[in-house]
Amino acid sequence: MLEAGIDIIEISRLERSIKRHPRLLARVFTPAEVAYCLARHRPGASLAARFAAKEAVMKALGIGLGRCSWQDIEITREQGGRPRVILHNRARQLARELGVGEITVSLSHCHAYAAAVALVESSFSEEG
């Protein structure tokens, strides 16, 4: 079974939220995600793309907000630059329970928006 999730976020909205609530960075992103994004030309766009990816993964898994920590879903990069999803703790446990095999994600951003699409392949089937 293949499930999809998609999310889009206004980059400036996330930037304002982080400015008002600096602890948001540590609550939502892993230290590796923060380090990577802050080293980029447009840190806000990179952070927003990862935020959208985390939401898209949650939607594709069907777990919704609150079932796992934001940091339980980590967005890294493979050697060639392709984004990679790493699940930790509760997100990993939920994925196992759902029979999740592979999770792929695609990120994009322009001047104003960041978006992500996640595809989750699982062995679970509603048909039995």
Swiss-Prot record:
Its EC number is 2.7.8.7. One of its GO terms (cellular component) is cytoplasm. The keyword Heme does not apply. InterPro entries: 4-PPantetheinyl_Trfase_dom (IPR008278), 4-PPantetheinyl_Trfase_dom_sf (IPR037143), ACPS (IPR002582), Ppantetheine-prot_Trfase_dom (IPR004568). Mg(2+) binds at residues 7, 55. It is an enzyme of class 2 (transferase). Keywords: Cytoplasm, Fatty acid biosynthesis, Fatty acid metabolism, Lipid biosynthesis, Lipid metabolism, Magnesium, Metal-binding, Transferase. Its cofactor is Mg(2+). The keyword Phosphoprotein does not apply. GO terms for molecular function: holo-[acyl-carrier-protein] synthase activity; magnesium ion binding. It is found in: Cytoplasm. Gene3D superfamilies: 4'-phosphopantetheinyl transferase domain (3.90.470.20). It catalyses: apo-[ACP] + CoA = holo-[ACP] + adenosine 3',5'-bisphosphate + H(+). One of its GO terms (biological process) is fatty acid biosynthetic process. Transfers the 4'-phosphopantetheine moiety from coenzyme A to a Ser of acyl-carrier-protein. Belongs to the P-Pant transferase superfamily. AcpS family. This is Holo-[acyl-carrier-protein] synthase. It comes from Moorella thermoacetica (strain ATCC 39073 / JCM 9320).
